[in-house]
Amino acid sequence: MPLALPITQRPLAGTYALFVVAVLGFASGLPLALTGQALQAWLSTEGVDIATIGFLSLVGLPYTFKFLWAPLMDRFELWPALGRRRGWLVLTQLALAGGLWLLAATPPRGALQVFALLAVGIAFLSASQDVVIDAYRTDLLAPAQRGLGASLNVLGYRLAMILSGGVALIWTDAVQGSGWSWPQVYRLMAAIMAGAAVLSAVALPRLLPPPPLPGDGLASTPLPSARNDLLGFLAVVAAVVVGYLTTLHAFTPVAQALLGPWLRGSTLSAALQSRWVDLLALLMGLAFTLPLAAWAARRARFETLLRGLGSYFSQPGAAVFLLFIVLYKLGDAFAGALLTPFLLKAMAFSSAEVGLVNKVIGLWLTLGGALLGGLLMLRLGLWRALMLFGLLQAASNIGFWWLAAQGKGSLPGLMIPAFDWGVVSLTQATPVDGGLLMVIAVENLSGGMGTAAFLAFLMSLTQQRFTATQFAMLSAFASVGRVWVGPLAGVLAESIGWPRFFIVSTVLALPALGLLWAMRSTVQRLDATPGAPLDD
């Protein structure tokens, strides 16, 4: 896709595009950590129980449904001077800054429901930002750049998570760190997001309008009216509200009746029994709400959504690819769903130690894994990279089982001396557990490689006319594991213990690899012709 740059800059356009992708990855990763592991660390320090923290991972629900409003971001242009993508970027980033500032002013213990609603709002804005960033990145990069571009995106993304996850944990350690409060951290992150909005407005290149796809019958079809788009979106929102109310008032009693005999004979606490009921009701509600929302979109003639998704689903094998997208990161997501509470509460590591190892050292290894994964993809190809990196991801979960079973001090550790780098400092030397360091190193290195290959796979499935809608749908399905396993993970960890929990996470990584083996020829053809129609 050509860049709308002055002609004298076009020889540098390819390098600049890759730089832009890394910067956008940073903007994407910052709020994700603040509604994920950083939020879990805040709740852990406030004394919230593991099962409740697991259910609060549902604040990330907007990530799984962002394809519902992605068509509006594909359809409407806010400010012609900024262009379609940059206009939405500036709006979402400014709103994120405001949302983070409000969250910092809300105590989680005293106003947990308000706190959760604000976190959902931040996740909605973050997911909306991701819709634009994913589409912008896919439009910006040529097919040959997508492997390296995916690696650079992970680089920026993980750097942001080092800041909002790792450095933030060191800041909040009262003994070894800076002794900041979590509200102070979130106010600083709000200021950074405001700065990102300024950069989006002045530094990002503007893309030229996409040309019609050759032979695309949709290219000559008039765009649906703005009225239909808005009414269609409102119809989908109404369906989701109906689904929520039905889950609350109908499916919860049904779940109680179904699980009652088993729960009465169990040794689980009353609170944990209630969580199992909530979990079953949640799954039933999801099975009801998604078809209802699809029906509402069709009845309301939400054509921008239906055409974008129809273009993808009209291709042979599309449903199988979606199943693979859900499964590929499932085991990794299950193991990592409550990793921060596991390390802080179950293993009793200090905030500074977790911040240094899991978020700083570990994320640098993830960056190395992402860059190594991008380079290996040039030689391995997409299918072999997905298979190899998927096997490594599954194997890395065994390390957490070992850590939970053996406990602290199983391997010799090391001492991190005190330092002051201005942005972050340690007031005294901090011991680092050797077992923790080894497990985090393996997990982050393999996870970075797997993420790079997975992003390249997602970009290969989209068609440019519907980039935002299709990529939002695909990445939303990819986030199903990360968001939806949280409630199950919290309940399961308290029910069967952490060692068995991590064995389950390893087993959950295997179905995707079997499916990938069955799809070998299809993925290889997709790698040869990115963006081409899928085949059986």
Predicted feature locations:
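Intracellular loop-helix junctions on the cytosolic face of multi-pass helical membrane proteins
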Residues: 1-15, 105-114, 143-324, 516-536
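Pair of pore-lining "gating" transmembrane helices in MFS-fold secondary transporters
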Residues: 10-45, 238, 314-335, 441, ...
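Short amphipathic helix-loop junctions that connect adjacent transmembrane helices
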Residues: 36-52, 251-270, 328, 337-355
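Loop-to-transmembrane helix entry/capping segments in MFS-fold secondary transporters
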Residues: 50-51, 143-152, 351-355, 464-474
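Helix-to-loop junctions at the C-terminal end of transmembrane segments
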Residues: 65-82, 368-388, 403, 407-408, ...
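C-terminal ends and interior cores of transmembrane alpha-helices
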Residues: 89-109, 391-429
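Intracellular juxtamembrane helix-capping segments at the cytosolic ends
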Residues: 127-141, 339, 449-463
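A late C-terminal transmembrane helix in Major Facilitator Superfamily
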Residues: 363, 461-495
